[in-house]
Amino acid sequence: LSAAAFFNFGTFHFGAYTHVWDTYHYVIGAKYFPELGYTGLYEATIAAEREAGLLPPGAVVPVRDLVTNALGTANADELLARWKPRLGERWSDFVTDVLWFRTRTMPDHFRRTLLDHGYNATPAWAILGSALARVSGPVTDRSVSLLLLLDPLLLLGGWLLLRRAFGWRA
C-alpha cells in the first residue's frame, strides 16, 4: 500500500511521472546551489528567461521574494544584469537547463512556479543532489529520469535492508 501511495496510485501529475514543478526546484536548485543558495533560484530563472528572449525588454513579472517570502514583482532586465555575472561560465548551462523545464509546461503554469516557496531542500540534498545533478550533465529527459529514479531505488534498498535484518515477515 505504501509503495502504491508513493507512486500516487498510478495517477501522475499531468499524465507523467515527472512532476515538473517539484523537479525544477530540486534539480536546478541543487545543481546551481553554489551560485544561487536558497534565495536566488527565482530571480536567476527570470534572468534566464529574459536572456532567452521569452520575456520582453523591461518585463516586470510576479515573483516570490525568497529572502522575505513576500509576493511582489521583479524587473527582468535588472535581474539579468545581476545574475548573469554571478553565474559566470555556468550562465549558458543555467539558461539551457531552465529552458528545458520552461518547455515542459505551459508558460502560465511555469510562471506560477515562481510564486512557490523556492528551493528548500535539506543540506544533505544540497550536497548530494548538487553532485548528482552536475555529474548527470545538461538537463535532458534522460538525466531527469535517472535523477528521479533515486527515490524509488533508495526506498527499495531500505526495504531490502529491513528484510535482511528482520526477515520477510517484518
Language model segments and positions:
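Multi-pass membrane glycosyltransferase architecture that uses lipid-linked
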Residues: L1-A170
